[in-house]
C-alpha cells in the first residue's frame, strides 16, 4: 500500500517494513507541532535509521516516522514489524538501532546485560505507545454490556457459561440478558495481546482467574482463531460469543465493546482517549533512572475513577549512549518527534496520545540519549 502525505512519500511494504522518506533539504531543529509538548526536535546524525519489532505499534510508528521526516527533512527510518521477540533479538545482535517491544528487556534471561554489551552503555526501556484492549462480544439483541474483572475472568476460564448468569446480570440492571451459552474465542497464535489481557484477568479478578499469563491463552475453554482478523471473523458469525481485540481493530470492524467496572468505582468505563489517558497518567514506574519500565499492575486496579484498565504498553528499547554518536543523535531526534508532533491524531492509529504529565517524564529520558 502507498499513502501520500504532504511533503513525504510513505510506503508500507509487503514484508511489513515501513519506510518514509521526506523531500527537501536538511534542517538542524524543528519545534514540535500542535499536540506535541515535549519541546524541539533536534535533527542530526545519520540519515537512515533501522528498527524492528512489535506489530502492536506498527500503526503508531507510521505516524511517528511521518512526524520525524516532517521535522527533519532528508532523514528516514525503516521499521520492520516482525514481532517483539525478533525485534529485541535484532537489537541485541546490533542489526538495528533500536527495538519496538510489547515487553521490556527481561533480566531473568540476561537481556539487559546483553544490551549493555551491545550498546557499550545501559539500554533504556521507554514506554512510548499505549493501546487499549477491548473486550468484544456478539449477543443477539444486546448492544450494551458491563463487565468487571472477576466476572470476565470467570467467563474466560469457563466458570460462567451462560449470558444470563446472575453474576453478569447483576452488573447489567435494565438489560434483559438471554440464556444463550457463552462461546469464548481466543487467540490461537502467540500474542502480546493475549499476554496483557490475561495479566488484566490475573490482576483484577481477586483470584478468580487462576491461570496466569503468557503469550498463549491459558483459559482452557473456547475456540481459538489466529490474529485479530481470525477472532473477529468468528465473533461476527457466532451468537453468544466473546473475545478480546486491539481497540483500533474493534473500531474498524464495528464490534460491540464491553464497558468495564473497575476497582476505582461502580460506574462502567468505555474506551476513550480520556479514560485511557487517565490510566497512562497514573502509571507507576518501577525501573531506575531513565529506564522507564512500568508496573502494569497499576493499570488493572486503578484508583482514579474513569480509568480504563486494559491497556497494552509497548516500548522503544534504545541505547542510553550509542557507540556511534551519529546514531545516538538520530535516535534522539526520532524519539523527540515521536513523543512531540507524533502524538497529534495518534488515536486515529489505534493508540492513545500521551498525557502531558507522562510525556514530560518520557521527554527527560529521550533528551538524555546520546
Swiss-Prot record:
GO terms for biological process: phosphate ion transmembrane transport. It is found in: Cell membrane; Secreted. GO terms for cellular component: ATP-binding cassette (ABC) transporter complex; extracellular region. It comes from the Bacteria. A lipid is attached at residue 23 (N-palmitoyl cysteine). One of its GO terms (molecular function) is phosphate ion binding. A lipid is attached at residue 23 (S-diacylglycerol cysteine). Induction: By phosphate starvation (at protein level). It is a lipid-anchor. Keywords: Cell membrane, Lipoprotein, Membrane, Palmitate, Phosphate transport, Secreted, Signal, Transport. InterPro entries: ABC_phos-bd_PstS, PBP_domain, Phosphate-bind_PstS. Residues 1-22 form the signal peptide. The complex is composed of two ATP-binding proteins (PstB), two transmembrane proteins (PstC and PstA) and a solute-binding protein (PstS). Functions in inorganic phosphate uptake, a phosphate-binding protein, although probably not the main uptake protein under phosphate starvation. Part of the ABC transporter complex PstSACB involved in phosphate import. This is Phosphate-binding protein PstS2.
Amino acid at each position: 500500500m502507498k499513502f501520500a502525505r504532504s511533503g513525504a512519500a510513505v510506503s508500507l511494504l509487503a514484508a511489513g517494513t515501513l519506510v518514509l522518506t521526506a523531500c527537501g533539504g536538511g534542517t538542524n531543529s524543528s519545534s514540535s507541532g500542535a499536540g506535541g509538548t515535549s519541546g524541539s526536535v533536534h535533527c542530526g546524525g545519520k540519515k537512515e535509521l533501522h528498527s524492528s519489532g512489535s506489530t502492536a505499534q506498527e500503526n503508531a510508528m507510521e505516524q511517528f516516522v511521518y512526524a520525524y521526516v516532517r521535522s527533519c527533512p532528508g532523514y528516514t527510518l525503516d521499521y520492520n514489524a516482525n514481532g517483539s521477540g525478533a525485534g529485541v533479538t535484532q537489537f541485541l545482535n546490533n542489526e538495528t538501532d533500536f527495538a519496538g517491544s510489547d515487553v521490556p528487556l527481561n533480566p531473568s534471561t540476561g537481556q539487559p546485560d546483553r544490551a549493555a554489551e551491545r550498546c557499550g552503555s545501559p539500554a533504556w526501556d521507554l514506554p512510548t505507545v499505549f493501546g487499549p484492549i477491548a473486550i468484544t462480544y456478539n449477543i443477539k439483541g444486546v448492544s450494551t454490556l458491563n463487565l468487571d474483572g472477576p466476572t470476565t475472568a470467570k467467563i474466560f476460564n469457563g466458570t460462567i457459561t451462560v449470558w444470563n448468569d446472575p453474576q453478569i446480570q447483576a452488573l447489567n440492571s435494565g438489560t434483559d440478558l438471554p440464556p444463550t451459552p457463552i462461546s469464548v474465542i481466543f487467540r490461537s497464535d502467540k500474542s502480546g495481546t493475549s499476554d496483557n489481557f490475561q495479566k488484566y484477568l490475573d490482576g483484577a479478578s481477586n483470584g478468580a482467574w487462576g491461570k496466569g499469563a503468557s503469550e498463549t491463552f491459558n483459559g482452557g475453554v473456547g475456540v481459538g482463531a489466529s490474529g485479530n482478523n481470525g477472532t473477529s471473523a468468528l465473533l461476527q458469525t457466532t451468537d453468544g460469543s466473546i473475545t478480546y481485540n486491539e481497540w483500533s481493530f474493534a473500531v474498524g470492524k464495528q464490534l460491540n465493546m464491553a464497558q468495564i467496572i473497575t476497582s476505582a468505582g461502580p460506574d462502567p468505563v468505555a474506551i476513550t482517549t480520556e479514560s485511557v489517558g487517565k490510566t497512562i497518567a497514573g502509571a507507576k514506574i518501577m525501573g531506575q533512572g531513565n529506564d522507564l519500565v512500568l508496573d502494569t499492575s497499576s493499570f488493572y486496579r486503578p484508583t482514579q475513577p474513569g480509568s480504563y484498565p486494559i491497556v497494552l504498553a509497548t516500548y522503544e528499547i534504545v541505547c542510553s549512549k550509542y557507540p556511534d554518536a551519529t546514531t545516538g543523535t538520530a535516535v534522539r531526534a526520532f524519539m523527540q518527534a515521536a513523543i512531540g508532533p507524533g502524538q497529534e491524531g495518534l488515536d486515529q492509529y489505534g493508540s492513545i496520545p500521551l498525557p502531558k504529565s507522562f510525556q514530560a517524564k518520557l521527554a527527560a529520558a529521550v533528551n538524555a540519549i546520546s
